[in-house]
């Protein structure tokens, strides 16, 4: 409802979404301008939210621009092509793309030497921003020139897991890792939230982005009673810029 109200008040706003929100937006008659896809896993597998990825793209609006990262699994890209999606490619930056001799070293002059075997053209723009598509969307929009971004649905938490879900674990057992609970609790502003390791990584990305001075005045957050909403409140409380309200009220 808040998103619909915002679009009504700002009819020229462009909605950029991630795959998990895409079907619900269409169901509620909100047609996204774009959907960012960053998924190196097969479309037949289950997503981080235990949804078969193919089901998320059961319906595709021909007007949606799908921004598909080059690291995306070919099965996802082929499914979108077969269903007539409008696709734009992009490269997501990770340190693993760099030449082996440069990996782990500080980047100089915002330029990196890539592994030539990857086939990424020299001078290509690489999108930074975080561990998931939602966070990369901020970097992508900023690269495109957008300077007024409103964040909806950034939560990074979930309802309390069921007894069955509480038995789920994560970890590469075959690789010698000790299995860990999939669902964990974290405390933000004296409030407990249920989350997962991947969602917690996104929350940490949010914390970094909210404190990035180059994004000052560009981001606006919409939402409450979520982990990220509390992180945004912390950001506002730490804000040190002078307030001239009293001056202008005189």
Which residues make up each language-model segment?
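Metal-ion/cofactor- or nucleotide/acyl-coenzyme-handling active-site neighborhoods
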Residues: 1-250
């Amino acid at each position: 409802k808040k998103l619909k109200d915002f679009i009504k008040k700002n009819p020229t706003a462009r909605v950029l979404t991630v795959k998990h929100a895409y079907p619900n937006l269409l169901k509620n008659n909100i047609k996204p301008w774009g959907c960012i896809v960053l998924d190196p896993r097969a479309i037949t597998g289950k997503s981080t939210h235990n949804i078969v990825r193919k089901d998320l793209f059961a319906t595709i609006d021909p007007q949606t621009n799908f921004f598909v990262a080059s690291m995306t699994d070919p099965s996802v890209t082929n499914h979108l092509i077969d269903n007539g999606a409008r696709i734009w490619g992009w490269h997501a930056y990770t340190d693993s793309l760099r030449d082996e001799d440069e990996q782990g070293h500080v980047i100089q002059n915002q330029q990196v030497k890539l592994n030539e075997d990857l086939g990424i053209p020299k001078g290509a723009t690489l999108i930074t921003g975080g561990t998931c598509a939602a966070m990369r969307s901020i970097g992508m929009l900023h690269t495109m020139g957008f300077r007024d971004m409103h964040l909806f649905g950034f939560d990074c938490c979930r309802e309390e897991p069921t007894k069955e879900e509480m038995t789920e674990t994560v970890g590469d057992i075959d690789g010698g890792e000790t299995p860990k609970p999939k669902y964990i609790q974290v405390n933000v502003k004296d409030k407990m939230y249920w989350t997962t390791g991947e969602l917690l990584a996104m929350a940490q990305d949010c914390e970094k982005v909210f404190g990035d001075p180059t994004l000052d005045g560009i981001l606006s957050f919409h939402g409450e009673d979520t982990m990220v909403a509390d992180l945004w409140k912390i950001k506002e409380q730490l804000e040190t810029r002078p307030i001239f309200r009293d001056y202008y009220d005189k």
